[in-house]
Amino acid sequence: SKTQESISNIFNGTIKNCEDLLPDLKVFISELPKDIDLKIKTTTNFISLLKEKSCTDSKEYEMLVDTLIKFDKTTATIIAKAELLIVKKRYNEAISSLNSAKAMTKDAVQLEDIDFQILEVQFHNLNNYQTAYRLALGISGSNKNKALQIAAKCVANSANSCGSSTFDRKCNYYYAAELAERAGDSGAASRYRSNAPNAEDKFNNNNELPI
């Protein structure tokens, strides 16, 4: 069939990039196998291929992911959907999908990884530093140090908006440095300390204190 011919071309390396792949993919989507297991396997293979060819921002990729979820709704497929939504800058929808994925698994490591993905969206994409900071402190396991690095960045990025005086605002960098040290990032800790109050700041602040 034409679908099988397209599949053969793709997996034999005839199709080299996203532009070559998508026209054949439209044929594939319209002629998916009727057998559910084969449908799932073939769709999964094409999702992997589109990732490899950097086609994840195409509407065809979203159609494939939605097709896979329809027939094989698992934690992995929901995460794939969330990653697609991140690419499309639909960040709140992505977080919703990741929370749905959390509800479908009891695997501790997978839960930690999903929590870290949510943290990254909150920090890198939405710039929600308060939310990201709170999430970061709750993350354990293999992602703990990376989460603490993000927590330190949240404190540093929010430093100028937290405190009633310049001295108080600069003091936030002490805490950012502490978090960075806990994360094992001594370089970042040193940079944060360089923004903390210096000897002159401390002297001037003491002079302002009530006698």
Segments from the language model and where they lie:
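Generic helix N-cap/helix-start motif at coil->alpha-helix transitions
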Residues: K2-I10, C18-L22, P33-I47, D57-Y61, ...
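Structural register within alpha-helical repeat arrays
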Residues: T42-L50, L64, K81, A101, ...
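C-terminal soluble interaction/assembly domains
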Residues: Y133-G138, N143-S164, K170-D185
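Long, well-ordered mid-to-C-terminal structural blocks that present hydrophobic/aromatic surfaces
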Residues: V65-G141
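Short coil/turn linking the two alpha-helices of tandem helical-hairpin repeats
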Residues: K51-S54, V87, L119-L126, A152, ...
